[in-house]
């Protein structure tokens, strides 16, 4: 849970900015968007497999460029 303590003499705008930054760093908004709708386990698995394939292809391209140089 993200929380901040407003310092003496601190404006509301700067406290709100710190709170939003802490929320972004904690990944709260991305988690809310991910959980907005129910996702079947089969769809989750399919997305994970696709993500792994993309990462492997990216890694393969990265290392093939290093070998050529």
UniProtKB/Swiss-Prot annotation:
Species annotation: Leptospira interrogans serogroup Icterohaemorrhagiae serovar Lai (strain 56601)
Protein's UniProt name: Small ribosomal subunit protein bS21
GO terms under biological process: translation
Any single GO CC term annotated in Swiss-Prot or TrEMBL for this entry: ribonucleoprotein complex
Family classification: Belongs to the bacterial ribosomal protein bS21 family.
Name of encoding gene: rpsU
Record's keyword terms, sorted: Ribonucleoprotein, Ribosomal protein
Start and end residues of each stretch annotated as Disordered: 49-69
Domain of life: Bacteria
Gene Ontology molecular-function annotations: structural constituent of ribosome
Matching InterPro entries: Ribosomal_bS21 (IPR001911), Ribosomal_bS21_sf (IPR038380)
């Amino acid at each position: 849970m993200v929380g901040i303590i407003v310092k003496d003499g601190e404006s509301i705008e700067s406290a709100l900015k710190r709170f939003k930054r802490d929320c972004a760093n904690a990944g709260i908004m991305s988690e809310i968007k991910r959980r907005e709708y129910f996702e079947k386990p089969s769809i989750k698995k399919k997305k994970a497999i696709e993500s792994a394939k993309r990462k492997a292809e990216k890694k393969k391209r990265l290392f093939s460029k290093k070998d050529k140089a």
